[in-house]
Curated annotation (Swiss-Prot):
Compartments in which it is found: Cytoplasm; Nucleus
Annotated Gene Ontology cellular component terms: chromosome, telomeric region; cytoplasm; histone acetyltransferase complex; nucleus; Rpd3L complex; Rpd3L-Expanded complex
Region: Interaction with the histone H4 N-terminus, residue numbers: 335-339
Name the UniProt record assigns to this protein: Histone acetyltransferase type B subunit 2
Similarity section: Belongs to the WD repeat RBAP46/RBAP48/MSI1 family.
Underlying gene: HAT2
Known function: Regulatory subunit of the histone acetylase B (HAT-B) complex. The complex acetylates 'Lys-12' of histone H4 which is required for telomeric silencing. HAT2 is required for high affinity binding of the acetyltransferase to histone H4, for the nuclear location of HAT1 and for the HAT1-HIF1 interaction. Alone, it is unable to bind to H4, requiring HAT1 for high affinity interaction with the histone tail. HAT2 also has a HAT1 independent function in life-span regulation.
Induction: Repressed in presence of farnesol, probably through a intracellular decrease of diacylglycerol.
UniProt cross-references to SMART domains, sorted A to Z: WD40
Native source organism of the sequence: Saccharomyces cerevisiae (strain ATCC 204508 / S288c)
Sequence ranges of the WD repeats: 116-147, 158-189, 206-237, 249-280, 293-324, 350-381
One GO term of the biological process aspect: subtelomeric heterochromatin formation
PANTHER family: WD40 REPEAT FAMILY
GO-annotated molecular function: histone binding
Amino acid sequence: MENQEKPLSVDEEYDLWKSNVPLMYDFVSETRLTWPSLTVQWLPTPVQELDGGFIKQELIIGTHTSGEEENYLKFAEINLPKEILSNEDPQEEAGEEYQSSLPAPRSNIRITAKYEHEEEITRARYMPQDPNIVATINGQGTVFLYSRSEGLQSTLKFHKDNGYALSFSTLVKGRLLSGSDDHTVALWEVGSGGDPTKPVRTWNDLHSDIINDNKWHNFNKDLFGTVSEDSLLKINDVRANNTTIDTVKCPQPFNTLAFSHHSSNLLAAAGMDSYVYLYDLRNMKEPLHHMSGHEDAVNNLEFSTHVDGVVVSSGSDNRLMMWDLKQIGAEQTPDDAEDGVPELIMVHAGHRSSVNDFDLNPQIPWLVASAEEENILQVWKCSHSLPIVGGPPKVNKDIIS
């Protein structure tokens, strides 16, 4: 017993991670926010090179002040070294000052606009067909529509309790799903010219407990998935009278789900038991596979839009994990097996509290923004030297203006 290693404290784990930053990352920025943000999303900002060799990207964040101050929906920008586009090493290009900053991640986030918001923002998501429009949901389940340039536009009331589920369709302009702790799901049409403040359809019987997440399918405009505290995963069709076309009984409640951007049949879901499950929509009776690595509940999932088969997850264990589904079943040496399953390609251990939300940049492969409970927002890109899917992904430099 005396020889047993004492587990590292959270601060010791952070210091260990920080010492490995130059080896594992091309870029890291860390910002301490005044208040924690429960939500983060990249805006689809065109990649433009600025004076000084930087590129600008933009983010949506919120505040959770616990009633102590006014809450705000915020828009932020960050300047990134242009070398991350070509998978070069920014440390080599930016000189001594940048090299010395990597072990102690610096902040270069700047708030460019903010709008007052009724209560905390649990989720904020932009409309894919019009990124000037942003939907939010708060701790009372009220949905709001904001214009980036003009502020609050509409208040959408239906839910009676806290909501975390919010999803715009990538296929139909203005088609918005919201879900709440009151067990209900609502469909809003906010881009059709009608009254956006009244739901076009609501569901009170999809689930018998809290709606943890809902997401639209990326290939079929009428399909959406829901997960709930009732331990059910449901695939639903807005055209069907009974709506639900498939139901999965989960081992424990799922907190999150995500549909692939590359395969119309692939779905991932995860929750309280810490595993990430993969399903084929053509046969949902049993999962295709489950991936182990997290040590606590998984709260968010996202498929890469750039690389087929890459999934990212985040959890209450303060970790984000990148998975390569093409590596499932790959042979490992005993030493490699001790580090994790073969499909686990990257662990981001830079957070010291539960990860509230994260997002993969739609323009720049492997660039991630992640927000944690303890007021920290990080922007990071894993090293191009890591053995990631198909070698380093390329960015089309024609998009740089």
